[in-house]
Amino acid sequence: RLSEEAIARRFGVSRTPVREALRLLAQEEIVAIEPRRGARVRSYSRTELSEMFEMRAVLYGLGVELFTRRATAEMIATADQLGREVLKVGKSPNVTGEAFAAATQAVTSQLIGNCGNARLTDTFRRMTRRSFRHFAILAHSTPVHREIVMGYVRPMMDAIAARDERAAGAL
């Protein structure tokens, strides 16, 4: 349960902005507000999570294709450097799920944020906010998942550099 009063006290504000923030989070399906019970962090069923990840994968592929088509050489160089950082972080023996997730999110932000389609970017970011705590940190905590992700990074960056939209989006 999320206590409006406790949150307001912690941040030194009245309950009104806290209530408004919780309402906005409810619109994003990050929290659920129940009458006479208050707000709580929203949980998702396996089916809902699976559906979110399927949609996110489609949006990611399209976003990468659009980035490959529209990006400047400088944007591509930045993405490549961020991809190298994912590989460096992922190979670290003491890497945490949080650190690996942050590295992959940096690449994703570069690609999706510069794909040239504001609606796709907004939808992707909203879906990421909903699912991040369920997926990124937990999944990126496993060595097997990190190896899978790292296996896609270099081929995707090479496809982007070659302006091969289809190959880049498929990875």
For each feature predicted by the language model, list its residue ranges.
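Short, flexible segments with low predicted structural confidence
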Residues: 20-24, 34-35, 50, 84, ...
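Short linear motifs at protein or domain termini
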Residues: 1-69, 74, 78
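Short, solvent-exposed loop/helix junctions and linker helices
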Residues: 46, 53, 101, 146-150
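Short alpha-helical transmembrane interface motifs in multi-pass membrane proteins
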Residues: 45-46, 135-139
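Conserved amphipathic alpha-helical segments that form helical-bundle/coiled-coil interaction surfaces
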Residues: 73-137, 149-159, 167-171
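Solvent-exposed loop and edge beta-strand segments that line ligand/cofactor-binding
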Residues: 141-145
